[in-house]
Amino acid sequence: MSQLAHNLTLSIFEPLRTTGTIVCTIGPSTQSVEALKGLIKSGMSVARMNFSHGSHEYHQTTINNVRQAAAELGVNIAIALDTKGPEIRTG
């Protein structure tokens, strides 16, 4: 589809369709369900968590909140896990 053909199909009355990926790193200030819903409404499609910081419980709460926010808005959100540096991981 040409750029002109694409532009002709756009409508101000339809929700914005993103063609890119917006990755947001989730931290303490964006961990709540309401904050996550705001990020999703703003275009977030991937929630990134930095495993270098935080406990297992903190990360589980974040995952649960991302899933709940996505379910309430009826969208799919990917979860990216950024693990610690160049270590050898087993199991």
From Swiss-Prot:
Pathway: Carbohydrate degradation; glycolysis; pyruvate from D-glyceraldehyde 3-phosphate: step 5/5. SUPFAM superfamilies: Phosphoenolpyruvate/pyruvate domain. Substrate binds at residue 48. It is an enzyme of class 2 (transferase). Keywords: ATP-binding, Glycolysis, Kinase, Magnesium, Metal-binding, Nucleotide-binding, Potassium, Pyruvate, Transferase. The keyword rRNA-binding does not apply. It comes from the Eukaryota. ATP binds at residues 50-53, 89. It catalyses: pyruvate + ATP = phosphoenolpyruvate + ADP + H(+). Coiled coil: none annotated. It holds the Pfam family PK. InterPro entries: Pyr_Knase, Pyrv/PenolPyrv_kinase-like_dom, Pyrv_kinase-like_dom_sf, Pyrv_Knase_brl. Its EC number is 2.7.1.40. K(+) binds at residues 50, 52, 82-83. Its cofactor is Mg(2+); K(+). GO terms for molecular function: ATP binding; kinase activity; magnesium ion binding; potassium ion binding; pyruvate kinase activity. Belongs to the pyruvate kinase family. Homotetramer. PANTHER family: PYRUVATE KINASE. This is Pyruvate kinase. It comes from Leishmania braziliensis.
